[in-house]
Amino acid sequence: MTALSVTVAGQPFDMMGYIAEQSILGIFFKSAYDAFNFENNVLTKITDADYPGWSTVTPTSITRSGSTATVTMPAAVNWQSGSTVTIAGAAETEYNGDFVISVTDPTHFDYEVTGTPTTPATGTITATGGRTTVPGVVYLDGYFFVMDSNAVVYNSALNDPTSWDALDFITAAIEPGGGVAITKTQNYVIAMKEWSTEFFYDVGNATGSPLSPVLSAFTLIGCAAGESVAELDETVYWISKARQRGPAVHKMVGLEQQLVSTPDIDRILATSDLSSVYAYGIKISGHSFYVLGLRDIDVTLAFDATSGTWAQWTSLTAQAPKSCTLSQSGGVATAACTAHGYADGAAVTIAGANESEYNGLHQIRAISANAFSFSVDSSATSPATGTITATGYDEGYFLYSHYVAAAGRDLVLHETTGDLVEISPAYYTDDGVPIALKLRTGKLDGDQEDFKSLGQIRVIGDKQGGEAMLRWSDDDYQTSSSCRPVDLSSEQARIRRCGAFRRRSFELLHIADLPVQLESLELG
C-alpha cells in the first residue's frame, strides 16, 4: 500500500488505506499532532493515551513551590521531559504560556514560573502537549507504524489502528539524530533521521514492537526534509543530507541508495531553507516523475526517472488585465499598452476586441515598454475596435502540490484554489491557463572559439505545435537576443540570418494550446 499526503486546514496529513474486517475499506490518517480512523462510514479520533500525538487535558491541579510549578494530571499521559506544553486558562497569569517541562512520573510534570503566583492555581485550566510525529505512515503485516521526532517508531495493535500500547515501540538508535520521516521499501520499515537511515523488518516479537533492526543496511545518509519523501515505482525518493555535504536527492530501491541529483540540482537545493517542501511521484505517457516543490525559492523540480533527466515545472498565474489598442499590418498585430511589463516571448491573452481574430492566447514580441506585437490573421480589420484588454501571467513554482490516482485517472490538487484536476498528456493547458515550455541548450562552440557564421536554425520534430519563439545568448546567459517566431507546423520550421558567435546557447519558447514534440536544433 502507498501512503497519500493531503493538507487540511493548513495541516499536512498522511493517509493509508487498508482492508478492515469483513472486507470493509478503512483509512488511517494522521498529522504531526492528531490521528483519525475512518471505517464503515464512521470517523474516529485516536484518543488512546499511548498514541504519540497531542492532546488537551484539564489538570487536576497546579501547585507551586518556589519557582517550580507542579502539574497533576487526571490520568497518565505519554508526554516527555524536554517537550513544550502550553498552559492556558489560569487566573494567575504567571502560570500561563509555553513551557519546557520535566516529567516526574506519568501523571506529573514540572515547569518553571516567574513571580510568586498564588498556589494552587485557579481558573478553567488546560494543558496541551504530547509527542510530534514526523511525515509518513507505514502499513506492514497488519500493523500501522508512525515515528516521532525523537526517532521512536510506534506500532498499533494488529489490524486495529485505534489501539496503541505503551510498550509497542522501537527506537532508531544506531546513530544520534532526530526522526525526520518514516516510509517503507518492500517489506522493510525505513526510519529516516537527520544524518542516517535505519531499516527494520517484522520478526514477530511476542511482546513490544514486532520490528527488529536490519543492522547491515544502516547508512549515514539522512533526510533533510520529511515532506520530500515520495514513492514511485517501488522506489523511494527524498532530499538527502550527510555531515560531509549539503542537500541532494537520493533514491532507494530495496535497501540500495543511489544519488540522482546533479551538481546543478544540488546548487538549487542549497539555496532553499527546505522549510516549505512538497513531493510526489507520478507517471505520464510512460515516464515516471519525482516532483519536488521548493516554495521558499519559488521552484519546482521534476526528475524523469525514465530518462534520468531533470526539468523545472512551473505554473502561470494571470495578472490584472491592462487596457490596450490594436492594429495590424501583414499578419503582425501591434498593441499599444502603457507600461505593460511583459517579457519578450511571454504569454498574453487578448480579450474584448470586436474582431475575434485578435482575441485569445498569443506569444508576444516585446517592442518597447509600451508596445508589443504578435501574429494574427492578415485579414483582421485594422484598427481593432471594442474594449480591449491584455492579460499577462506571472510564472512561479508548480501549484499542483498533491497527487492521487483514483478511478483510473491521475489527479492533482491546486494548493490555492482547491481544484482537483486530471493531469494528462492530452491536455495542453493548466486548467485553462497556458503552459510555458522553455527548452535551453548548453553553450555550443564546436570545440573551438573562432567566430562562426550561422545561416539558419531548423527545428527538428513533429510537424505540429503552431508558432514558437527562438532566441539565443552569446554571453553566458547574461542577455538574450530578441525572440524570433518559427512555425513548428511548417515543413521547413526554421529561421534565417542568425549572425555570428564564438559560443552560443539557444532557447525555444512555446505557449500554444497545442501538442509539441521536438527532437533537436539543426544549425547550418
Predicted segment positions?
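N-terminal assembly/attachment segments of tailed bacteriophage virion structural proteins
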Residues: 1-28, 32-37, 41, 48, ...
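Beta-sheet repeat architectures centered on beta-propellers
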Residues: 1-27, 220-236, 241-319, 387, ...
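Beta-propeller and closely related beta-pinwheel folds
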Residues: 2-14, 42-54, 130-143, 147-278, ...
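Recurrent small/Gly-Pro-centered beta-turn motifs in extracellular repeat architectures
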Residues: 29-31, 113, 148, 193, ...
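Short beta-strand segments and strand-loop junctions that repeat across beta-rich extracellular domains
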Residues: 33-38, 151-163, 197, 202, ...
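A short loop-to-beta-strand structural motif that recurs across blades of beta-propeller domains
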Residues: 34, 99, 196, 247-250, ...
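Predominantly extracellular/luminal cell-surface or secreted proteins
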Residues: 38, 86-90, 112-114, 154-159, ...
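Small/polar beta-strand repeat architecture
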Residues: 48-132, 319-394
